[in-house]
Amino acid sequence: QSGLDYLEWFAEEAKRIYGDVIPGHMSDKRLIVIKQPVGVTAAITPWNFPHSMISRKAGPALAAGCPMIVKPAMETPFSALAMAYLAQQAGVPDGIYSVVTGDPVAIGGEMTTNAMVKKISFTGSTRVGKILMKQCADTVKKMSMELGGNAPFIVFDDADIDAAVTGAMMSKYRNSGQTCVCANRLFVQAGVYEAFSQKLAEQVRAIKVGNGLEAGVAQGPLISQAAANNAEALVNDAKDKGATVLCGGQRVDADANFFAPTILTDVNKDMRIASEEIFAPIAPIFKFETDEEAIALANDTEYGLAGYFYSRDIGRVWRIAE
């Protein structure tokens, strides 16, 4: 549904692509800005939301009058191909919405170096984003990028704990923790640390893992064996450095990619899980004492994208937000 919502939104917004009239340096002159299509655009999309991420990129491009070439993730090509088929059935002219699948290095290299492509939109890792930016430099392409995330989730001692637990469930375990805006590091003030951890654990233990087509199942597998192996490695590293597994902590099936929804307590910043993007249903909970400590911990990352915090003190809300 979110993919359809994107298309509808951008189709309507295309009616409001306004220009600007800017006062000139002389009283009898006006500067007029008219927005026009940039030209052929390309999108490199991730696997975690294979339909909606394409709609989010192709929707505004097509609405603005720009042909779009999509390279979907190798793990999830079928959504893009199905959209190409539907576009053809709907009467979209050939060449306006195109899909290319295959070797990501070769396709990405062509997109970044071909002078016909005027703009690239990419969602993925920071490492790959840097490579694409370097490759685009020779043709000075416009770029829009959404890169890796390491979102902090802060719970202050005056927060509504039940609301914070509900928020953590939504922002951490959605899509098995495989979103770039997932809560990656949970910082909880000492006064409510135990209460929050136990209430969250009650909710997490109730998550049913399995086939997403079965009734009651809320979490499916991770995208690949490599992803499950990485989740396992992060938990083991944290345990080796003193973390406590409050729940989960291992694969549901040793031969599959289902990973149990996990909570780690007694976490510290020396653990890999404190600095790496997790992309798994693992919630590491850090304890803090003061507002200043929470801000320092939250900002101690090279990533961005999102942040969450819970408090009922309006002064604290503004101070932390700013």
State each model region's role.
Residues 7, 65, 97, 120, ...:
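Residue-level signal for inorganic ion chemistry
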Residues 64, 70-71, 122-123, 182-183, ...:
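Thr-Gly-centered strand-to-loop micro-motif
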Residues 6-9, 19-163, 288:
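Rossmann-like NAD(P) dinucleotide-binding subdomain of oxidoreductase/dehydrogenase enzymes
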Residues 117, 154, 208, 236, ...:
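Conserved C-terminal structural/oligomerization subdomain of aldehyde/semialdehyde dehydrogenase
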Residues 60, 110-111, 167, 237, ...:
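Well-formed, non-transmembrane alpha-helical positions, independent of function
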Residues 69, 98, 144, 246, ...:
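Structural detector of well-ordered beta-strand residues that form the stable sheet scaffold
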Residues 56-58, 234, 316:
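Conserved sugar-transfer catalytic core signal across GT-A, GT-B, and GT-C glycosyltransferases
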Residues 119, 127-268, 297:
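ALDH superfamily catalytic-core signature
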